[in-house]
């Protein structure tokens, strides 16, 4: 006898990231933090190996009236000023001319999961990269949605050919397409598409839309740590070229932008050529929000609005220090990796660098050997994720060489 619904996946969840983080923590306690390289943590850490909580974010949050913190949001779709601020923040200087709306969500995870449930039925197929944040597949699975994966890379660039082949395969079995592009600052490789790659992608989606409706979910969780921050939104201008039968939902997260991982604040920005198309998606998302989380934290929304308006300049200045720090860390690691011949996927910017693995059997052996040497990383599909977002500079130096030595010992 069972009590859960018949369609439920009863396989216990295994979160590989948290289990490895726990092993690294235990090793530090036993052998001393100075003897352990912990490149697992996917949050921004300072050189003191402590979580960064931006002063310009939390000093104002602490000053918010307790009643504001205690109160419900004014709407389950989000406070009006917050929804407006999210749209303006997401697009910034990009000249986006599409009809739009914003639904407030508990973080970027809430935005992505709500979008998947909005556009796909049980038995449908979601298209995602073969190297990706593991939660995409889990979000699909809990809704009995299948997953088809495109190959992320062809040599050192985005594999548009694989995207096309994967979409064409899915087109044979359903009359609508829903796919995820995590860009810029892809998790876990640090790749960012060029504007030309975006143009080619949009052009192809327009071709697909002649026979199938298309929804593109653009997960921008890490965009506010782009190394080219002033031009990080330029690619969004390619969205203006979408056909009437294409919709884009930009999935925004305050977790990284405001170092507010636990406040659960984000939004789904719906974009389409026609207002009625946006409204149709908005109606379902409003109901989904009301039925699932009711509303998101009122004070988190209030804080975001203040930061991106009155508090913007000092916030941007403080955050830039950590962007520069992460850039320094990644440059050191990549330079040394290239010197010793440690293969990695094409990295441009972001929280993570991912080493190339020929297959997952070899990856697992390498991952185990790294841990035996007190080096903790996260195994991803055909890769080993190195979190430069949390690794202090002193521990970045020499890491690539240590990894290469371990690789040689396996070969």
What kind of feature is each model-predicted range?
Residues 219-220:
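Walker B catalytic acidic pair
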Residues 88, 92, 96, 168, ...:
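PLP-dependent enzyme catalytic core of the Aspartate aminotransferase-like
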Residues 41, 305, 319-337, 342-356, ...:
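Conserved glycine-rich beta-strand-loop-beta hairpin in the small C-terminal domain of fold type I
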Residues 85, 104, 241-323:
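Conserved core segment of the aminotransferase class I/II
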């Amino acid at each position: 006898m069972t009590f859960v619904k018949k369609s439920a996946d009863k396989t216990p969840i295994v979160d590989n990231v948290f289990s490895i983080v726990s092993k690294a923590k235990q090793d530090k306690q036993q052998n001393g933090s100075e003897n352990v390289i912990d490149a697992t943590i996917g949050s921004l850490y300072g050189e003191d190996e402590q979580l960064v909580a931006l002063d310009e974010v939390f000093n104002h949050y602490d000053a918010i009236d307790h009643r504001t913190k205690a109160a419900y949001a004014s709407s389950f779709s989000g406070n009006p000023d917050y929804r407006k601020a999210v749209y303006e923040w997401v697009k910034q200087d990009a000249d986006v001319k599409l009809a739009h709306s914003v639904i407030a969500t508990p973080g970027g995870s809430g935005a992505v999961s709500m979008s998947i449930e909005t556009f796909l039925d049980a038995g449908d197929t979601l298209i995602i990269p073969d190297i990706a944040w593991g939660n995409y597949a889990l979000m699909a699975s809990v809704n009995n949605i299948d997953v088809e994966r495109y190959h992320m890379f062809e040599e050192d660039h985005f594999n548009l050919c694989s995207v096309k082949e994967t979409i064409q395969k899915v087109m044979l079995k359903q009359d609508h397409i829903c796919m995820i592009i995590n860009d810029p600052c892809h998790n876990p490789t640090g790749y960012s598409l060029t504007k030309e790659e975006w143009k080619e992608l949009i052009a192809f989606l327009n071709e697909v839309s002649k026979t199938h409706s298309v929804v593109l979910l653009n997960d921008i969780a890490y965009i506010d740590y782009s190394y080219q921050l002033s031009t990080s939104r330029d690619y969004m201008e390619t969205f203006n070229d979408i056909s009437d039968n294409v919709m884009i939902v930009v999935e925004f997260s305050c977790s990284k932008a405001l170092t507010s991982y636990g406040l659960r604040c984000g939004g789904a920005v719906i974009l389409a050529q026609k207002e009625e198309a946006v409204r149709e998606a908005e109606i379902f998302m409003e109901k989904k929000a009301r039925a699932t989380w009711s509303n998101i934290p009122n004070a988190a929304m209030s804080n975001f609005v203040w930061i991106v308006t009155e508090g913007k300049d000092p916030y941007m200045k403080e955050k830039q220090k950590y962007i520069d720090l992460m850039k320094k860390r990644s440059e050191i690691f990549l330079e040394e990796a290239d010197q010793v011949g440690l293969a990695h996927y094409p990295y441009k910017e972001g929280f993570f660098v991912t080493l190339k693995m020929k297959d997952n059997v070899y990856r697992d052996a390498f991952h185990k050997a790294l841990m035996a040497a007190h080096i903790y990383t996260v195994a991803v599909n055909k890769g080993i994720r190195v979190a430069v977002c949390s690794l202090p500079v002193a521990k970045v130096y020499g890491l690539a060489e240590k990894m290469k030595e371990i690789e040689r010992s396996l070969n």
